[in-house]
Amino acid sequence: MLPLLKKLYLTFARSSRIIITLVIIDQLSKWWFIDNLRWKPDLMLKFTSFLNMVYTWNYGISFGLMREYYQYSNAIFLITNTIIVCYLYYLMIRSKTIGSFAGYSFVIGGAVGNLIDRFFRGAVFDFIHFHYQNYSFPVFNLADCFITIGVIILIEDYYSTKKVIEEKAKGNYDNAQIEAMAEKIRNTDKGGNDKIASLQN
């Protein structure tokens, strides 16, 4: 029981630093752009020819989906996202690699950042807008970036771990083959020596 509690405490202590840092960065960025963009003409701040900061409230899910069902979707996604965050935290506690631990921490940090928006503001604030000529990428925020980074880390960690396991299994298989061949040679040599000994007798 004590080792389990110690593991839970250490996991909480390590992950909290990452998650809280990401949430603070996300919320500070939203606070700054909410405070500054609302007074800009067209609610927009142009950074480059392909990047704008825009004042946008997302009442749906990612990329503005289901915004027409806002009065139902906000409560539903508050509940479902909270459940998902709790499940991800459970997976993080069980993670066995640094990569998976970091990946889950980033995903949880981003998810909590957007959950705070939904709970206190009733919608998620998005402000980063990439566009090129006639193409316009859906507006997003730093929390979405953290979630994406976390997913990429988890995918990379999965395939790296899988490769290590396969190489280890292959190494064990090769060692078993070598041992079997050595045993066969020893048996063959023993049989040959017995025949020689019988001839000598």
From Swiss-Prot:
It is found in: Cell inner membrane. The chain crosses the membrane at residues 73-93, 97-117, 135-155. The active site is at residues 126, 144. Its main location: membrane. Pathway: Protein modification; lipoprotein biosynthesis (signal peptide cleavage). Its EC number is 3.4.23.36. InterPro entries: Peptidase_A8 (IPR001872). It holds the Pfam family Peptidase_A8. One of its GO terms (molecular function) is aspartic-type endopeptidase activity. GO terms for biological process: proteolysis. PROSITE patterns: SPASE_II. Disulfide bonds: none annotated. Keywords: Aspartyl protease, Cell inner membrane, Cell membrane, Hydrolase, Membrane, Protease, Transmembrane, Transmembrane helix. GO terms for cellular component: plasma membrane. It comes from the Bacteria. It is an enzyme of class 3 (hydrolase). It catalyses: Release of signal peptides from bacterial membrane prolipoproteins. Hydrolyzes -Xaa-Yaa-Zaa-|-(S,diacylglyceryl)Cys-, in which Xaa is hydrophobic (preferably Leu), and Yaa (Ala or Ser) and Zaa (Gly or Ala) have small, neutral side chains. It is a multi-pass membrane protein. Signal peptide: none annotated. Belongs to the peptidase A8 family. PANTHER family: LIPOPROTEIN SIGNAL PEPTIDASE. This protein specifically catalyzes the removal of signal peptides from prolipoproteins. NCBIfam families: lspA (TIGR00077). HAMAP family: LspA (MF_00161). This is Lipoprotein signal peptidase. It comes from Rickettsia africae (strain ESF-5).
